């Protein structure tokens, strides 16, 4: 019953987004402001990125790197474009994993609500955040966590478990963590890897992370993308391309995850955490070097 209700919520949210996107694309076309973004390169990048996203590797970092490398998307509309592109893929992810992985209802629903509340609070206070400090702290924290996970896999440290739900102080920690991750999504830090790490460290089955993190992101993305669409701060053609081809990558990856051995999945989690730590550090380093390079260029 609960699974059916959640699926209806996700479907309604997805259809609402589709209506808003089609309406916005039509208006831009009528006004002559529809972007000239190349459709197929963006669609291919979106399909691959969302394949990786379903495995737990956040798609934001992959897509941002590709868009900047090939100069496909204007930086001014990049945040809105990324948020819009993730709606239908995350809705697809949620529809697949909500029913396939039996997470304890209280844990699933409460963590989704916590993430949504964090995103709502963060949207009002995001301007006061120091993104550089957040990136560096997250990079170091995830690196430490990766070390703990590897130690557990090698039998040096007890970590992970088989639980499909949380209670007591562990649930409280999970709710606080997901609230914070929801806040951080407003500064471009994806929820997937931190949520997966938290769930694993609290003793849950790694597979339980998938419906939790995907359900949380699906709820958030519908609201955040709607805001960007209303403001017109997005690339309509790029969003449309990934809205079509992103879910295809999701379905292919979901088939792989479902058939994956649990021990292999634990190793995948560890490598995803290390990768995310590196991308956080790389973003911090790039943003730190930019003002210095600009000063050197001006002096030259």
Go through each PLM region and give its residues.
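Juxtamembrane transmembrane-helix boundary motif
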Residues: 1-49, 98-186, 200-201, 206, ...
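Hydrophobic, membrane-facing alpha-helical anchors
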Residues: 33-34, 57-66, 88-92, 161-172, ...
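Short helix-coil transition sites and intra-membrane helix breaks within transmembrane domains
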Residues: 50-60, 182-192
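Juxtamembrane transmembrane-helix termini in multi-pass membrane transport proteins
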Residues: 52, 58-103
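Interfacial segments of multi-pass membrane proteins
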Residues: 63-77, 193-208
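Paired intracellular helix-loop junctions of major facilitator superfamily
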Residues: 72-75, 228-229, 262
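Transmembrane helix-bundle signature of multi-pass membrane transporters/permeases
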Residues: 79-87, 210-218, 243-247
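Membrane-helix boundary/interface segments in integral membrane proteins
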Residues: 198, 222-229
């Amino acid at each position: 019953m609960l699974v059916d209700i959640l699926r209806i919520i996700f479907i309604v949210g997805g259809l609402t987004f589709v209506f808003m996107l089609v309406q916005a694309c039509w208006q831009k076309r009528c006004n002559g402001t529809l972007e000239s973004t190349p459709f197929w390169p963006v669609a291919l990048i979106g399909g691959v990125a969302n394949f990786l996203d379903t495995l737990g590797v956040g798609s934001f970092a992959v897509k941002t790197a590709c868009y900047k490398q090939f100069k496909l998307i204007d930086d001014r509309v990049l945040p809105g474009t990324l948020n819009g592109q993730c709606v239908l893929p995350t809705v697809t992810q949620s529809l697949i994993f909500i029913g396939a992985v039996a997470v304890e209802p209280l844990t699933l629903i409460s963590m989704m609500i916590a993430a949504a509340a964090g995103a709502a609070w963060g949207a009002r206070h995001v301007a006061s955040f120091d993104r550089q400090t957040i990136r560096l702290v997250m990079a170091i924290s995830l690196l430490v966590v990766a070390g703990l996970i590897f130690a557990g896999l090698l039998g040096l440290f007890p970590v992970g478990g088989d639980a499909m739900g949380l209670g007591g102080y562990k649930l409280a920690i999970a709710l606080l963590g997901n609230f914070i991750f929801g806040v951080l999504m407003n500064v471009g830090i994806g929820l997937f890897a931190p949520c997966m790490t938290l769930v694993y460290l609290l003793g849950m089955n790694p597979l339980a992370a998938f419906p939790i993190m995907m359900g949380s992101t699906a709820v958030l993305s519908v609201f955040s993308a709607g805001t960007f669409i209303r403001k017109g701060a997005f690339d309509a053609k790029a969003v449309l391309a990934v809205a079509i081809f992103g879910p295809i990558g999701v379905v292919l990856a979901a088939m792989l995850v479902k058939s994956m051995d649990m021990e292999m999945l634990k190793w995948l989690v560890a490598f995803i955490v290390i990768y995310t730590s590196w991308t956080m550090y790389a973003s911090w380093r790039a943003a730190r070097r930019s003002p210095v390079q600009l000063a050197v260029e001006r002096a030259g």
